[in-house]
Regions:
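FIC/Doc superfamily catalytic core
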Residues: 1-281
Length: 281
């Protein structure tokens, strides 16, 4: 399959040789991405990104001041979003079996959110912490073969059950490239820079999902990372905003928005979607 990508977002790297060769996407480090904060959308009539980010920041602080605790709601929305990913292949084991799995995943996610927020008081937001949270989130017999708490050491691809490394519409970074990309992301997360924190949160969320460091559970991992980043930056104090619910309600623009960055380099379009989602979370 011929893969089209914009050099602003990254490039495709050829791995292996002969019949086992495949191409995987390598994202540009976020340190290289400069967002046009005056971008006003495709029609030039929408609020500038920086103004929208400031407005979203006010909204989040107001929500946080309400003091609501939404851990269970966030967990439920995160699991629903990941289970509803179009490319996910669900086992045909009947509704009751699937519901039991979702219930286990939801309970695990509640524990992971609470553990993560507690850990921020003594640990930096890092790959080590995310691995620990992934281990908590991926408990249960149905997750045993998904390497809980470990970064993947094999290629994965996004597609349906008929796709292969050759035909899949998207292939995240190969293991070596993934480790380098995650290291760059970790440095970006903890860098002392002048990027607006909510614009930075949008970029971090995108980058984590495109890196896809785990065999499974990356959707929940991305939601955890976003929530913890907002806490680490002092924007939230706990689980006060259910952003995964908005993503779940707007699944199509959420997933196409992530994909469009790779294809066309439209980071600004993704950032706008993310900020607008925060405004209604």
């Amino acid at each position: 399959m011929k893969r089209i990508t914009d050099p602003r977002s990254g490039y495709y790297h050829k791995n292996g040789r002969g019949v086992t060769a495949y191409e995987s996407f390598v994202p540009q480090p976020l340190q290289h991405i400069v967002i046009n904060v005056e971008d006003k959308g495709h029609n030039g009539q929408e609020p500038a990104l920086l103004a929208l980010a400031d407005k979203a920041l006010e909204h989040l602080k107001a929500k946080d001041a309400e003091g609501k605790e939404m851990t269970e709601e966030i967990a439920e929305s995160s699991v629903r979003l990941e289970w509803n990913v179009p490319s996910m292949v669900l086992l045909s084991l009947g509704d009751e079996t699937e519901k039991k799995k979702r219930d286990i995943d939801q309970q695990n996610m509640v524990r992971a959110i609470r553990y993560g927020i507690d850990c921020l008081e003594r640990l930096p937001l890092s790959g080590r912490l995310l691995k620990d949270l992934h281990w908590v989130a991926m408990q249960g017999e149905h997750n045993e073969k998904k390497y809980p708490g470990e970064f993947r050491t094999s290629p994965i691809w996004m597609g349906d059950e008929h796709d292969t490394l050759e035909s899949a519409p998207f292939i995240p970074p190969a293991p070596d490239d993934m480790l380098k990309a995650f290291y760059d992301l970790e440095q970006y997360i903890n860098a002392d820079d002048d990027v607006h924190p909510l614009i930075k949160a949008a970029l971090i969320h995108y980058q984590f999902e495109v890196i896809h460091p785990f065999i499974d559970g990356n959707g929940r991992g991305g939601q955890l990372l976003t929530l913890l980043f907002l806490n680490e930056r002092g924007i939230l104090k706990g689980a006060a905003v259910n952003l995964p619910r908005v993503f779940h309600l707007r699944q199509f623009p959420y997933f196409t928005g992530l994909a469009s960055v790779e294809i066309s380099g439209t980071y600004e379009k993704w950032v706008r979607f993310f900020l607008e989602a925060l405004m209604v979370a």
